[in-house]
Amino acid sequence: MPVGSRQNRVQAVRKVSGSTDSTIPREAGIYPIRYTERKERKDVQTVENGTNEDSRASQSRGRRRRQPTSRTLRQTSQSRPEVLERNESGSDCKKGVHSHSSARKVEREGSRCASRGLHLSSTTRCTAXELDVAKQEEKEEEDNKEGYADEEQKIENSTQERKVVNTSMEDKATSHSTKGSFRLTNSDSNKELHKAIKVRGSLSKTDITEKAKFVNEVVEKEIISQVFKIDNRFTFDILHAGSYYERLKVGEADEFDIMVQLNAAKLSNIFQPRFCVARRHSRHLVGFAYLEYQSHFDGHKKWEDLLETGGPDSRPLLSPKLILEHFKELLSQRLHQINCVGKQPWRSYCEPSLHGPAVKLTFCLANDKTLDIDVVLCIQSQHWPPVANNWGVLNPLQWPGAQQVENIKKRGCHVVPKVNPRDQKCWRTSFSLAEKDLLSPKSIDEDKEHYKIVKVIFERHKASLEPLCSYHLKTLFLWLRSDGNWTEKRTQFKVIEYFIQQLLEKVRMKELPHFFIGHNLNLFSDLSDAQVTNITTCLKEIIKNK
């Protein structure tokens, strides 16, 4: 009769207890035969179900079934002997154990051991041979795991190698074959470009919104718009132009540009612009204009204190230097008025100063952040400069279209008080509103993102690239955009590389035509040989990314 039969178990219990009574205590785990058979059938079904579930799970993973380790056998044989003993006999489990998942796990382990020939004796203790077998299987399992790990690592390394090869092939396929060109590689070593891309999107929306609100509600409404209370000649229309409104702003939101259009009564009649033409003796004045005073329109002679003599045909002119100084003084007085009230929306401010054609205002806000604002005074001209009449006509552009060119010309232009070094009575022609019209449509947002990355790189090397400025970059961007296909079949890396290479070539040739005036005005004509050498050296280093 088998070792685990009911009769043998009864005899063993009677021998231990010294009893000959046919009644066996329930503590011995002996139940009536019918109940025992029912429990055996239930336990066998539970074990089979667990085994089938494990088998299906292991097959779905594509790996062989995990084998119990020596640690599992020691735990099941030493710490839970009563469970294995009663399971082997087909009797009930320890109270409170059979209803838990841990008991089911132990039963399944026992079934697996039995299926592999690892018989557990009636005393539920593993023999030395069984432990050796378990240890050997545990070692094999660890070896298999290491094998799987090594195989996965090989697959991952192979995948990375394929990615590197594909990237290298893509770079070779898209690289320029021009002799002497410098290639901006699309790799992790290109730290310059990756930093620029990161900085490009670093503008905090909360920060820029707070500062834009300060500019709109304080600077525009409380300062600039209230200047007329001090001098009623100075009434303004605010023109939202500049990098922020063109969505070309990069870096910190600590600088804003505001254009204010002088809008006095009959101003366009009182001052008539006289644009300089491209003549041999006055080529240096292309892009500038005189504002000639028409005295018969100024009945009260209100503007005589801002005039100077010595213009063409000996007519009085509106002086850019005098009006800029007067405008700065008006802003200073208005700041003092607000500061005296004691409810100023800033912690401190600096006295207004001249910064090119602008008056610079500097504020320290309540959060200790500094904000610089350049207020540019301008006067509108109803006429398009004759020197720019050929824009978009002689050489039709891919962009913008003919209709957009015509609409821009009808709106005229502006003049700002930036003097010419050779003639300080001139006003510089400004095409800011025309540039805003060209750069505002969302259809060119993708190209603008490329330009912003280049602009970030420029800001990082600004000192080494002097006297280049952001306006030179914008002009080149407009020219490249007008070609229509500068981004065609190029990745972002290649577009930026192409932009910098074009800038390098323009500097080397000392030639960058004004976008609207064309070759009549070369923005790089005043570059010295030393400046060209410094700029080209810096640009080569940027492209090489050393």
Swiss-Prot record:
Residues 1-10, 175-186 have a biased composition (Polar residues). Mg(2+) binds at E255, D257, D374. InterPro entries: Mab-21-like_nuc_Trfase, Mab-21_HhH/H2TH-like, MAB21L/cGLR. GO terms for molecular function: 2',3'-cyclic GMP-AMP synthase activity; ATP binding; GTP binding; metal ion binding. ATP binds at S243, E255, F256, D257, S432, L433, A434, E435, K455, S470, Y471, H472, L473, K474. Residues 35-45, 82-95, 145-174 have a biased composition (Basic and acidic residues). Its cofactor is Mg(2+); Mn(2+). Pfam families: Mab-21, Mab-21_C. Its EC number is 2.7.7.86. Residues 69-80 have a biased composition (Low complexity). Keywords: ATP-binding, GTP-binding, Immunity, Innate immunity, Magnesium, Manganese, Metal-binding, Nucleotide-binding, Nucleotidyltransferase, Transferase. It comes from the Eukaryota. Belongs to the mab-21 family. Nucleotidyltransferase that catalyzes the formation of cyclic GMP-AMP (2',3'-cGAMP) from ATP and GTP and plays a key role in innate immunity. Directly binds some unknown ligand, activating the nucleotidyltransferase activity, leading to synthesis of 2',3'-cGAMP, a second messenger that binds to and activates Sting, thereby triggering the immune response via activation of the NF-kappa-B transcription factor. This is Cyclic GMP-AMP synthase-like receptor. The lineage of its organism: Eukaryota, Metazoa, Cnidaria, Anthozoa, Hexacorallia. The gene is cGLR.
